[in-house]
Amino acid sequence: MTRKYFGTDGIRGLVGEGPITPDFMLKLGWAAGRVLMDRFDGSNMILIGKDTRISGYMFESALQAGLINAGVDVGLLGPMPTPGVAYLTRTFQAQAGIVISASHNSYVDNGIKFFGGNGTKLPDDLEDLIEKQLEQPMVTAEKLGKAKRIQDASGRYIEFCKGTMPWGFNLKGMHLVIDCAHGATYNIAPNVFSELGAHVTPIFVDPNGTNINRGCGSTKPEALQEKVVELGADLGIAFDGDGDRVVFVDHKGELVDGDELLYIIAAYQQEYAGGCDGVVGTLMSNFGFELGLKKLGIPFARAKVGDRYVIEMMRERGWRLGGENSGHIVCSNVTTTGDGIISALQVLLAITTLGQKLHKIKKGMAKLPQVMINVHMAKRADLANNETIQRAVKLTEEKLGGSGRVLLRPSGTEPVVRVMVEGEDKAQVKELAQELASVVEAALS
């Protein structure tokens, strides 16, 4: 079916514009409650968590009212990282978990994503059923649900994160600068790392409802890079607004992205954890990452962009590790979804076990220069059948001479086409990416 609301990562958009409005959220809560209660037996509870956007409070109330109207009991978690909602949904044996967040976007956006009772994102068929239910008139259940606050939800998640580490693991003597993006990890991540013994300098931990991701977090790590060098810290760690992404900064202030972090975790597993059966990346994963894994004898496969597709391929192949260069990393041996804090702990475990600085470990793989440019598009476009664009793509590939890649990918969450060019020569890659982006922009205008 053609989807009206759900994208690749739930429902997302500008607050106040359809469907990101209180009246829609009321109806969405009711529709989701009806579908999930009709489909499953057992728990009658659905959990709701959110990041720190000011609009999250009104959407929480609207969803809560809709769910209660459908006869569903609601557990309110308050500010909670997206993976924390997934974890608590499992441990409470809830019917589902709902996250109110627009991830790394500005506060003017918000969105909704659902987790099933097993802590994984809802399959497409259930999202389709919710869309169908949204077309029906809202009817009040004979028995209304109830709502309650879940006590010490943050503390439960903190203990879970620490519990994923082997007995005796500690970070004593390590100075970490933690950038929480004024987001959902602000009161959780610093406690996890400090309780494991690290000296923690937290930054961007003062959310006011409108400053989430503003000049900070995993997509804007420049301030973190400066702070690590200024303080002479060992490492910097940056999360995005909802805590499912992570990137590192080494002691020299150099950024370490998701591909490099995945490589480090895989190298650790291969040598110290009984081997790494394989790693799932995406179409955007750097070719140098693939070559680095090949040197270690670790299989690699590419999924479509989006953590749900990474997780699907991991399940299909029976592999335990996957992720994206943006910092979405999934370690399925310890959790069910992308989790910034858990992934950071896995990297720290690798660093402490290997006994080397991050700056040195990451050099095991040599990234190829990669340039990505976002081109705005007013409406969805058929890139594959646009002759002008395809001629430009072919010409770019010819200029790379078989030593690089070209990828055009419409974003699943924003009205943009991502133009990516990868190759051996940085100057050439930048020039070709700009030329191709100009052609795409002209063709879509």
UniProtKB/Swiss-Prot annotation:
It catalyses: alpha-D-glucosamine 1-phosphate = D-glucosamine 6-phosphate. InterPro entries: A-D-PHexomutase_a/b/a-I (IPR005844), A-D-PHexomutase_a/b/a-I/II/III (IPR016055), A-D-PHexomutase_a/b/a-II (IPR005845), A-D-PHexomutase_a/b/a-III (IPR005846), A-D-PHexomutase_C (IPR005843), A-D-PHexomutase_C_sf (IPR036900), Alpha-D-phosphohexomutase_SF (IPR005841), GlmM_bact (IPR006352). It comes from the Bacteria. Binds 1 Mg(2+) ion per subunit. CDD domains: GlmM. Its cofactor is Mg(2+). Transmembrane segments: none annotated. Pfam families: PGM_PMM_I (PF02878), PGM_PMM_II (PF02879), PGM_PMM_III (PF02880), PGM_PMM_IV (PF00408). SUPFAM superfamilies: Phosphoglucomutase, C-terminal domain (SSF55957), Phosphoglucomutase, first 3 domains (SSF53738). The active site is at residue 103. Belongs to the phosphohexose mutase family. PANTHER family: PHOSPHOGLUCOMUTASE (ALPHA-D-GLUCOSE-1,6-BISPHOSPHATE-DEPENDENT), PHOSPHOHEXOSE MUTASE. NCBIfam families: glmM, PRK10887.1. This is Phosphoglucosamine mutase.
